[in-house]
Structures are given as C-alpha cells and as structure tokens.
Amino acid sequence: KESAAAKFRRQHMDAGSSSSGNSNYCNQMMKRRRMTHGRCKPVNTFVHESLDSVKAVCSQKNITCKNGQPNCYQSNSTMNITDCRETGSSKYPNCAYKTSQKQKYITVACEGNPYVPVHFDGSVFLPATPLPSLPAPHKHRLLWLEGNNSS
C-alpha cells in the first residue's frame, strides 16, 4: 500500500517545473498522478519546490489544521504552487481543470519518524499567527489594573 508520505509526494510535489504559460498543466498532471481514477478530485495543489524545502516546513511554524488537529505547519516563506480546480463543465471520466499559478505560504500536516508531510492543508497569501506565540490572556488587563493602582 502507498504510504501517506508517498501519496503526498505523488499528489502534491512537482519540483523543478512550473505551470506558467501552460493552461493544460492541471489536466495533464491530475491524470498523470492518478487523481482522475474512479472520480475527478475536485481541488488539488502542486508545489514547485524541492522535496527538501517542503519537508523543512515540518519544522517551521506550527499551526492548527483545518480539522482541528495540532500537527500542521506553515512555510516561513512563499512557495511557487499551482492550484488545480475542477471546472463547471468537468464530467468524469473527462475531468477538466483550471490551472492557476501562485506564490503562497503553504500549510502541511506532518507525522511519522522521520517527521514528513502527509497532507496538504491549504495555502494563503498572508502568514498565520503561530500557535505558541499567541499573547497570554488577561496580561494587558493586569497591567492596566496595576497602572491604575499606582495613581
């Protein structure tokens, strides 16, 4: 059986290439990477960066995954990615996709030993606030009270 890490590489890694100027990129890649077998996968993202730099995200900014799990990580810098989104006219087995190339921060879920990406959780134009560095609650209120007492 395909491991979660291998599945991540198959579905999301396309290092050393780019979709720029190729509106057919998603149609070709979604088929080539077996995401149109049995059904059309509605949305998928390919990352055009080295596997090492995507693996490194697992030691970058820890954030909560969309499903509430705590093992997601956001990249410290933007990455060259391609979003593939099924078009309205797409009908299995003739899956059709719109190709959009972007520079965004990516979020991946990581697990295992070695700790590697196993799920692509999303991408954003603006970085998130990491989990541990959220401000401690009530701190500003305490300071305000202390400031008042000294008057």
UniProtKB/Swiss-Prot annotation:
Q: Which InterPro entries match?
A: RNaseA (IPR001427), RNaseA-like_dom_sf (IPR036816), RNaseA_AS (IPR023411), RNaseA_domain (IPR023412)
Q: Which residues are sugar-modified? A: N62, T129, S133
Q: List the residue ranges forming a coiled coil, or say none.
A: none
- Record's Pfam families? RnaseA (PF00074)
Q: Top EC class per UniProt? A: hydrolase
EC number(s) recorded for this UniProt protein: 3.1.27.-
Give the matching Gene3D superfamilies. Answer: Ribonuclease A-like domain
Give the record's GO biological process terms.
defense response to Gram-positive bacterium
The entry's localization annotation reads: Secreted
Question: What GO MF annotations does this protein's record show?
Answer: endonuclease activity; nucleic acid binding; RNA nuclease activity
Q: What does the record give as the active site? A: H12, H119
UniProt-recorded name of the protein:
Brain ribonuclease
Q: Which source organism?
A: Axis porcinus (Hog deer)
Query: Source organism lineage?
Result: Eukaryota, Metazoa, Chordata, Craniata, Vertebrata
Q: Which gene encodes it?
A: BRN
